Design a protein with these regions (language model features):
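Helix-coil modules at protein/domain termini and other flexible surface or pore-lining loops
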Residues: 1-148
Length: 148
C-alpha cells in the first residue's frame, strides 16, 4: 500500500477520504503518476476520493478504479470508486453505480469517464490504487483555532 501511495505521489500526506460529490466549478485534470503538483507539506491533510485493492496470494490480481461524470457548464459532478479482482468487474461496477446516481439527479452530466488500474501478484503483495485529489490543507490553522 505504501509503495502504491509513493508511486501516486501522495505518501507523505494524511489522506482524508471524501464522499463522491464533485463541487461546482471543479476542474478534473488527469495525470499519470506520480502527481507532481500537489501543494502542501509533510503530514498535511489531503482530501481525496480513492479506490484501492490489495492482494497477497500469488497468481491473483488487484484492480481499482474511479469513474466520474461532470456537468460541463457548472463543473459539478460525481465520482464513484470500485475495487475487485478483474478489470471487467470494476469497469462494470463503475458504470452501473454512476448510471444509478445519475438517474436520481436532474443534471446532464455527459459521458461516463474512468481510470482503472490493475496489478498482478507474483510473489509479494500488491496494491492497485487510483486517487482523485481535491486539495491539501495545513494543520497549522486547525491546531491554532482549537487552542483559542
Amino acid at each position: 500500500f505504501d509503495s502504491a501511495l509513493n508511486h501516486a505521489g501522495v505518501a507523505n500526506f494524511n489522506l482524508i477520504r471524501l464522499s463522491s460529490v464533485i463541487p461546482p466549478k471543479s476542474k478534473i485534470i488527469y495525470t499519470n503518476p506520480p502527481i507532481k503538483k500537489i501543494e502542501g507539506n509533510w503530514g498535511d491533510k489531503l482530501f481525496v476520493v480513492m479506490a484501492e485493492q490489495r492482494v497477497d496470494t500469488p497468481n491473483t490480481e488487484a484492480w481499482a478504479g474511479i469513474g466520474w461524470v461532470q456537468d460541463k457548464n457548472t463543473g459539478k459532478g460525481l465520482f464513484v470508486e470500485h475495487e475487485g479482482n478483474s478489470e471487467k468487474k470494476v469497469r462494470s461496477d463503475i458504470t452501473q453505480s454512476l448510471e444509478a446516481l445519475m438517474a436520481t439527479r436532474n443534471v446532464n452530466f455527459g459521458e461516463i469517464q474512468m481510470k482503472v488500474v490493475g496489478r498482478s501478484c507474483k510473489h509479494e503483495p500488491v496494491c492497485a490504487l487510483v486517487v482523485a485529489v481535491y486539495q491539501s490543507q495545513s494543520w497549522e490553522k486547525s491546531i491554532s483555532e482549537n487552542l483559542n
